Amino acid sequence: MSNHSEAYGSRDQRREKYTQGKEFEDGTLETLESIISAVEDETLSKDYQPLIVFFQRGFGAQLVQTWSYYAQVNNHGKFSKTTSLLTKTLRVLSSDTSTVTIGSGLIRLILTDYTKVLYRGLNNMRAQLTNPILRLLKQIVNFNNGQHIEELVSYFDFSLPILPRLLVPSKSELANGNSSADSSKHDSLRFTFIKFWLTLISNASPFVRKELLTENFKIMSNLFKFMNKADSDKLSEHILSVFINDILKEKSFKRTTKTKILNELAASKIHHFYYSSNKNLVKKANEFFLTFGASRDFSVAFPDNCVWFKNSVADGASHGAPITVNQVEFQIHNKLLFNTLRLFKPWEDTLQLGTLIKILENVPELVAPYSIFLTTNGNYDPKMTSYWFGITLLINKIINLKIPQFMEKVDSNIPPATSLVIENILPSLLTKSSLVKSLQFETPIIRQLACQSIVLALKKLEKVSTFYDQKGWRNEKTILLNEFHTRIPDLPIFVSTLSNSLASNKDNRILPLSISIIFNYYSKMFPNLFSINLPSSNIYTDIMQKSKISGIEFAILDNYLQFQEFNSTQTRWWNPSSGGNSLFTLLLKLASSKNASNVITTRISNLLDELTRTNVIFNISLISPVMALVNSLQGLSLQVSEIDNMEQVWKWFDETISRVVKTPYKYVDMAKEYNYISPFIMCLSEQWKYVDKSGNPEFLIKWLILFLRNMIFIGEDHIGIDKLVKNVFPEVSDHDVNIYLKLDSFEENIKKTNSSNSLISSMKSSSFFQYISALPSKNLMNISRLPVNKLDAAGILFRVQLLVEDDSVVYDNWFEATACELTGKIASYMVTDTEFPIIKVLERYINFALPKLAIEKRNALLMKKSRFMCNLIGAVCFETGHQLVEFREIIQKVVFSGENVEEYANYNELYQKEDVNAFLTSVSEYLSTSALTSLLMCSTKLESTRNILQKLFNEGKTIKISLVKNILNKAANEDPASIKEVNISLAKFFEENKVCVDASSDPMGKLSLSETTSLINSFVSSDLNYLVLKAFYRWEHFSFPSFIPSIWRIKDSPLLSIVTTAALFKHMQDKDFSAFAHETISKYGNEIAKSTYTTSKSEIFDEILNMITTYIDFYDETKRNEILKCVLSQSDHKYHAATVRYIAAHNNFTYPGVETWLHKTLLYLTKYLSERKVISNSFFELLRAMAELLKLEEVPNKLNVKIINSQLEAILGSEWIKQIKVLEYVIVLIFCVSKKSIQSQRMVQLLLSNDSYSSIMIKDNDEDSSYRKFLSTMILFSLFSIDPVVNSTPIVQEKLLTFYSGTISSNDKLILKILETIESHTATSWTNMIFSWEFIKDEEEEILEAIGDTRLITKEREGLILTLQKNMIKKSIDRYVLERPQVPELYTDSNTNNYDATTRCDLVKKYYDDTERSGVDMYDPLFLLLLIIHNKELVKMVKDDEGNVTYRYEFENFLDCKIFQFIICSLSDCHTVANISYEHLSNLASSLEKKTAQMNLEKQITSKDNERKESDSDLIKYNSIYQVLIKRILYQRQQNQDPINPLIWFSISRIVDLLGSPTAPLHEKAYRWVLSNSTIRSWDIPMVSDVMMSYNKRQQDDNKKEIDMEIYYGELSWVLTTICKGIKTDEDYKMLEKKGVFEWLLNLINMPYLKERLRELIYFIFYKVQRVADDGGLNLISRNGIVSFFEVLNNNIKSRLPQDDILNNIGTLRNENRGTLNTTLRLAQEQNGIEKLLLGYNELVKSQKRLILWTEGDSDNVVKRLRK
């Protein structure tokens, strides 16, 4: 009370003070109130002038003072009234632009000086006072669209304890619940505060909103706590809308932020709204959960890289949170969502059911644990309850979920966990016993639903089984099938259910259909276990004996016939029943009836196709003959008057099918006379004479003609059909034969075919096949209908075939367009029917395209059209991805001789070579590599040669040198332009070393003498081959000794001799070459010197000049000057790269005209870069040459400053800075001139304001992006360093911060250097501008990949947002780089007047190369360690009672974000970094001690709470072990013991992870290691010795051998990973060698069951040793015999690999067996790794004379053996 009295005076004093000011203040308030009322009352034009005058006179301040005074003297009525008046005033002031400024001033006055008045009103906790304050705050938020929100957040303390209390409803409100009247709720403190709070977070910027919601968790907790008890429906809807729109759909909020705000409490309270009587609220709650869990864009679901795997396929670890459901353990990434799903009761309403299924579909990892969770609700024994029906629907929908997309995309040799997969197929709730009970339940609906669940499970099993086959998981598939089989009822149960169903209700067809489907799937999935014994009288025999069958009965038969294949007894579908038809005929009846839908017709046709395929009934070359038969019968069904006579047809079919199945080869022999048409047609013709033709046989003739016509269209021989009709069917008139069955005059007969009495005419509207068959050719381009079945597509193929074979149809644009249009319709159809056999027509077109020499006449038109069709078929196969392998195989089989097509196979001698070339060229886009290379060997057209070479190059294929020789020989007399294009392509193959030798005796693979001689003979065939020859000399297999005997063969070829002389300059010591070179340089040097070089030879001027430049020292001064004079006089070549190179080599800038030439050349460069949109290759060459010239010592003094600055402006302000060669030139240009000459400030501004530079730094992510970023930043660094004082501005600093990534990359180091310089000149730190921190966890990495790179620093309106990535910190630990190059000093005092551009360029290049070798994928340690002290979540500022400021390290946060591990790892760094790390460790130790002491004190106070006591004890123990570890590290430093190797520090950083994972197998060992000693020992690598010794111990224990070995492999994996990632220095290598680790690793490789991943780790350890150890690990060669060890290992792998080229046969392997492909690729990968190691050791051996002697010179033989 005393404090209160001192602050406000006594009661009497306050009353007196109030009385004195009452009259004035009341008058002021009344005046304002009247003004506000007047403004609000006016409807049209509002007069704000009185209000403006009121505030201009200073009454605004008095108003606020009065308001504050009322609060002080506790005049509640006046205080409340004044608060409301302030609210109205602000609302009015916000309504007009003329008064907004006044309102802003009033708000700032309240926030800066009177926030305590706001607090006082809130603390009163009375609706009369508090509600007006909340409404005032709400108005401040709304003022001018949220203009003052940030000021409100800054000045107003939202951590006030009173704010959460405002959200606690009174007892009366809780008693009334949601049923209380809205008016009463509007007066509640909770309602008013929520309205203010929702308005605030809705209008706040995302960053402010995030801070409000995350920092004020007590407010949010109280808001959630009473949502379902006290809030009205309308308010609840508003709350949910804000949650959805402003939290979940806020794009800047990461998932961690959303889960931190909307936690389990929120989800549990919101779920109650599903049971609200307000439908709108229910919909809004459902919308919330759909967004919360099912939205791919906005949900809180973290990406899961396991799904059906127990551990991540990326790193073999599980990063999920452990949960236990019904005693089953899971590791999941979305624990919040799982706990949310547990709230749902999907069996109660469909809304919850639909939402739950969508969440499971979005987060498939939750399916397995949720399926187990369902078992906690009780068993699944059948009951006629709503719960049972609801849970059945839920289970069925779970089973129906698709295979997760992650699983579809994953490529892993490790199979998924069967326990997880089976829950997705058959959830545990569906136990075998419960299913049996359901199948035997007395109520049919229960039995049906049980069958439905099993059917869905079997369908899912089939899909997953196929998926396993695609992934190559064959062994795990067997385990999965066995597990599924044990969970479903036995077959006799289903048979019994089927029998009981028929006995109780014969008319019930639904349950028998379900059981038939089960039998069908069962027979497919478990063929060896499928065997059922049906009673003699069963539903299947009953249906087959019926005269008519319904659609559902057909479905039953369909399934029955399919599973009969696997049953012991086969159904004789071809035999007619007594007094009835055969099943074959019955199905034809059903398919061809008027009432049959397209789906039924297609399904029956497919079924009959399957039945007839195993018998010799139709020719296999036909496309769906049964569908053609059905289509003809459908035509008869349209003839209503003839239906009564159909029995004749059905009997005819019965006899035909019965006989053709029983004696098929009889009819095959009969067909010989008729070009081997189908046996079915032959039997049909045989039975024709027995058909009853009494009455009206015309309809039979009509059908017969239609059927035979259909058969011709799908591939039956039309000549054989014509002959058969004439011999066997005399009733068919010649007129009908000519119209319907003759193809010679097809186009003429179409009009007659379309007559009104034709069956075809009547079928056109219902059958696409008949429509396309009767369409005139001119209308084929305008088809709007699409094929819907195989017969329709076959009809299209036949019409195309007619166009091809019709000689009256010329090959023109119309033909091409029509063929493309029709083939395109087939391609669109094949999207849905991948098995359509388009490939069947290919051979026919190939036969047309390749007439045989001895037999067939050449028809050029037919050949050309057929080649085009082959190309279209290849395009369809390629685009649809189906039958491409078959396409290639057919072509190779026909075209090439022999069964196996090897490279350069010979053509089939039956065909003309020119025809084969033309044919293969037409389909070259779709041929295999072997076929293409064979084509290149024989083809003569250079255009196709160029295209094929380009295709092979783009696909990364290699070609043989013999192919190059062949192409050069064939191109000798072709068009020069074509030759040049082909030569450019060939040169690329040489430059990329994609040309291999055919045969070589040289162990290093060099070209032999005979091969070189032969190739030189090909080169001299044309002078234009100089491009290939130039690349040939740089080829890795080029051998100078093999070449020199043939050198004089190129003497007479000017370009070839010039190129040879220039390229082989280094071989001038060879006598023969020296003589050749002197003759060449003398001849062409004299010609140029005398200016006698003719214009006709000007095309080789540049090559001559390049040669002269190379040999410039061989000319005297006079001759050089003569050549220079000639060069300067050549206007056509003055600005060529060759000219620049010669002038640079001549290096005489005092020669008349050279300086002028230099200025003009620079002007030419500026003009070119300013005007051109595209840069040519020749200009890039010019830039490169100019860059070399500018490095010369004399050049800087000759440069014109204005020209240089204008050129820099032209480049730095344009898009050319994206070109690496341009950037390299600019760097040289900057380095070669005086610092004072460049306008650095302008250039810096130009570069930083260039959008292209921003794009380079932020967006570029291609293979050259790193070098491009470095060059552009180096330019900026150089320009900045010219005048750092002037360039050190806040704008430059802010722009650079957005480009900085905080890594050790070369460009980041340059940016950091600039930032340090700016800070030193401005004396302000950029860290003061940090507004917020973001920390991205592992789970959000997938989002980053989707939205692109997340910058370390981003600029927002509020300030800088700094984002750290946990994954990046982990990478920084794993790839910690110790040797990091420093930024070179380019402008120091020592070289201020020394403009040696060459030295600077060399320094820059060396810096980049060294940095790239060290790796860039890690944070800069110094930057990160200094930055973390500014993060409040890591280091908090704490004030004690006396006001002293201390800093507390939040250890748990350090641990969680991996920075603690990073600190330990950085102890191996330089002294500066290590000292900072030790300082951090000291502070962490101090903070841990204080926290432990505080927890002990709290533990004593709250010891009565046993649960808390136990958890606190665990936490104390948890912190204590880290304290011990930190003290060990600090003690080691204190004792100044031996330095600790980086490998040990890295191992300790990994120990930290084990200490925090109690379930990890190595946790206990890690714990013991920490407690084992008081210091860190320089030779003690954690865990290594234990694991090395534990193998033998485990082998001795036979009882636990299997279990322990599995644990051992886990421990081994940890140790190998630690060594692999941690070995960084030669000291690490020596330490491992002393401990015998390498010998142990070699022994491990011989372990028979060592996992592939562990084997790869061992190989990589040796790979790193070769590069880390100072001597490369030579002792491993001499002491451990590692070379011979790996060579034996390599030979073993070779023997297990296929002999063919693996890369060129991947497609074949993939189609044959995915498992075989995976095995082969794994072996190939292992072999590749071993060969790399052997090549490395070979280089080490050759570097030591002692080892060369020790190995007796066998190193080259090792390489030779590898190349065999």
Swiss-Prot record:
Stretches that traverse the bilayer? none
Q: Does the keyword rRNA processing apply?
A: yes
* Keyword rRNA processing attributed: yes
GO CC terms, sorted: nucleolus; nucleus
Source domain of life: Eukaryota
InterPro entries noted in UniProt: NopRA1_C, Npa1_N, URB1
List the subcellular locations: Nucleus, Nucleolus
Q: Which GO terms describe its molecular function?
A: mRNA binding
One BP term from GO: maturation of LSU-rRNA from tricistronic rRNA transcript (SSU-rRNA, 5.8S rRNA, LSU-rRNA)
Q: Where is this region: Disordered?
A: 1-23
The Basic and acidic residues compositionally biased stretches are: 9-23
Q: Which controlled-vocabulary keywords does the entry list?
A: Nucleus, Ribosome biogenesis, rRNA processing
* PANTHER family tied to this protein: NUCLEOLAR PRE-RIBOSOMAL-ASSOCIATED PROTEIN 1, NUCLEOLAR PRERIBOSOMAL-ASSOCIATED PROTEIN 1
Q: How does it assemble?
A: Associates with pre-60S ribosomal particles. Predominantly associated with the 27SA2 pre-rRNA. Can associate with a subset of box H/ACA and box C/D small nucleolar RNPs (snoRNPs) required for peptidyl transferase center modification and with small RNAs snR37 and snR42. Interacts with URB2. Together with DBP6, NOP8, URB2 and RSA3, forms an RNA-independent complex, which is required during early maturation of nascent 60S ribosomal subunits.
Other observations noted:
Present with 5890 molecules/cell in log phase SD medium.
Q: What is the designated name of this protein?
A: Nucleolar pre-ribosomal-associated protein 1
Gene behind this protein: URB1
